[in-house]
């Protein structure tokens, strides 16, 4: 699956055409009020491009929350998004109370030029994800014929398909892979994601450094193994470093995270790194706590001293930060996935913050810096560095699967150039 050879919105002739666009409007809500409109704002450039270039209509479809294939308009309706869109676009948005069926098809068949139409939550139909569960917890499975009909109805709502929902690209859902139209293009959000991940995965600048944090080795095995085939340097930090250090250095790790499953393959990982000539850097000192709480007693430890019984490492220490900075200073491309400490608590945030400062420094000297979604993207928001790095991915699961070397169904389904 080539990331750089996919049809993009700017290569489409949209004049006079009905555009059906998959967006990510899965926004946080409280009492049917949107609490953060970032994802809606992010979709505006693609929508505006279509309107500015004479599209007849832009029909928007999205999921919201996890209604699991059951209509729950009281809790998961996209109706509040229509009002938000109206104010961001400065034009009327027609909200439809369903996403498929004859009424919806009729409303989208012959719209006035420049119409913007928002469909109701795709996941009110079990045919979107293929499975779900009813309110009593019984499992629901969509029938193949009904999935076909659902996809056919969505396909009637436009002449051209645009996908701008990178965060759902790793899911083979109907709205991601089942729209049967001759031209299927990425929107501008998706395009930027694919451009940056292509820089890392298809033709990287070197030296290429991957920084991998997070808690469990077992969750990151695929990621580590795939990246060892791509990078020159790797930093392994966060909770999973304790498993490596215990196995490799026989370090006393006290009550720190230890991953039994992951421990079994530490030697394999090191052998692969050795074979590929990849240098892996681990932490050398730690900020410790006497319990897993924000107000825990704080201590220090090194690999040599070990972490005493009952204490746990929750961050890396100042010597480690210096060591990481030296490795980062050489890099021309950095991909960072996973924090290196419990950054949500100030006492254990210094390591991740120091890393972020170095990432910003690297970016300003021309290094390409890519932040994988999820917790690492949350760090960017916390320290206000989203515009001080090259790219912050909007998709936690999708970016992880790309870095693991997997094919993303939602990207694979787009037209090739």
From Swiss-Prot:
Where mainly located?
A: cytoplasm
Per the record, what are the reactions this protein catalyses? (2R)-3-phosphoglycerate + ATP = (2R)-3-phospho-glyceroyl phosphate + ADP
Residue numbers bearing the Phosphotyrosine modification: 196
Q: Which GO terms describe its biological process?
A: gluconeogenesis; glycolytic process
Binding locations of Mg(2+): 215, 218-219, 375
Keyword rRNA-binding assigned: no
Q: Which GO terms describe its molecular function?
A: ADP binding; ATP binding; metal ion binding; phosphoglycerate kinase activity
Subcellular location(s) per record = Cytoplasm
Q: Where do the annotations place (2R)-3-phosphoglycerate binding? A: 23-26, 38-39, 62-63, 65-66, 122-123, 170-171
The EC number of this protein is 2.7.2.3
Residues reported in the UniProt entry to bind ADP: 214, 238, 343
According to its UniProt record, in which pathway does this protein act?
Carbohydrate degradation; glycolysis; pyruvate from D-glyceraldehyde 3-phosphate: step 2/5
Q: Which residues carry this modification: N-acetylserine?
A: 2
Q: What Gene3D superfamilies has UniProt attached to this entry?
A: Phosphoglycerate kinase, N-terminal domain
InterPro entries reported in the protein's UniProt record: Phosphoglycerate_kinase, Phosphoglycerate_kinase_N, Phosphoglycerate_kinase_sf
Q: Which cofactor does it need?
A: Mg(2+)
Family designation: Belongs to the phosphoglycerate kinase family.
Assembly information from the UniProt record:
Monomer.
Q: Which PANTHER family match?
A: PHOSPHOGLYCERATE KINASE, PHOSPHOGLYCERATE KINASE 2
Q: What HAMAP family does the database record attribute to this sequence?
A: Phosphoglyc_kinase
What's the stated role of this polypeptide? Answer: Essential for sperm motility and male fertility but is not required for the completion of spermatogenesis.
The protein's name in its UniProt record:
Phosphoglycerate kinase 2
Species of the source: Equus caballus (Horse)
